[in-house]
């Protein structure tokens, strides 16, 4: 089974690629390398014994996304991590976040819904809960107004996916996790951004 992991050389994406390959899936990783490095591919290979197929694609380029899905029309599922992710940066540069986190998502959804098997996992965020009314937060907690443009892009993304799933053959799930941190136990992959690390233990 062939699985596409967008943002596949990022922090969460690279760990997911490792787990998928260890389970026997054929993995294609897409990344535009805006906040990651090709060195991650070597780390994945040292852990699993195999490099994933890698495509250097910016998902904001619609034609590139269309070309990719024509090339790999036998994909069984997509795990979508590709996104800008820093809350503070999103406040300073909201248009970058709306372009990268929303446009790219729409372009991927437009193509995956054309496939025979449309399975989609979305990397959302605990930020969709906003200023939570009840603690601790559970999966049943209500979504509150976003506290940042980043959080808003995740809320909008969830709404888009929900709407698309209602009228297509796409199966989808939304992952709202809290502050994933730390390196792989092998220390071969971890938080290796080009800028300031966001996923380190204080």
PLM features per residue range, with description:
Residues 1-77:
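N-terminal Rossmann/SDR dinucleotide-binding element
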Residues 85-89, 111-119:
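A short helix-coil junction within the Rossmann-fold of NAD(P)-dependent oxidoreductases
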């Amino acid at each position: 089974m062939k699985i596409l992991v967008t943002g596949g050389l990022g922090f969460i994406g690279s760990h997911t690629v490792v787990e998928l390959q260890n389970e026997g899936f054929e993995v294609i990783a897409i990344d535009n390398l805006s906040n990651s490095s090709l060195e991650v591919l070597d780390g994945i290979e040292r852990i699993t014994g195999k490099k994933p197929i890698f495509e250097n694609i910016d998902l904001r380029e619609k034609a590139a996304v269309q070309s990719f899905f024509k090339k790999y029309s036998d994909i069984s599922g997509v795990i979508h991590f590709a996104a800008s992710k820093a809350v503070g940066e999103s406040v300073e540069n909201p248009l970058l976040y709306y372009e990268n986190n929303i446009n790219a998502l729409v372009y991927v959804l437009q193509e995956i819904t054309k496939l025979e098997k449309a399975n989609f996992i979305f990397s959302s965020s605990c930020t969709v809960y906003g200023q939570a009314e009840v603690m601790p937060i559970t999966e049943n907690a209500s979504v509150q107004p976003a506290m940042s443009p980043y959080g808003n892009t995740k809320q909008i993304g969830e709404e888009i996916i929900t709407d698309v799933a209602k009228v297509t053959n796409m199966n989808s799930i939304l992952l709202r996790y809290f502050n994933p941190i730390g390196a792989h136990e092998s220390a071969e992959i971890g938080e290796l951004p080009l800028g300031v690390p966001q996923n380190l233990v204080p």
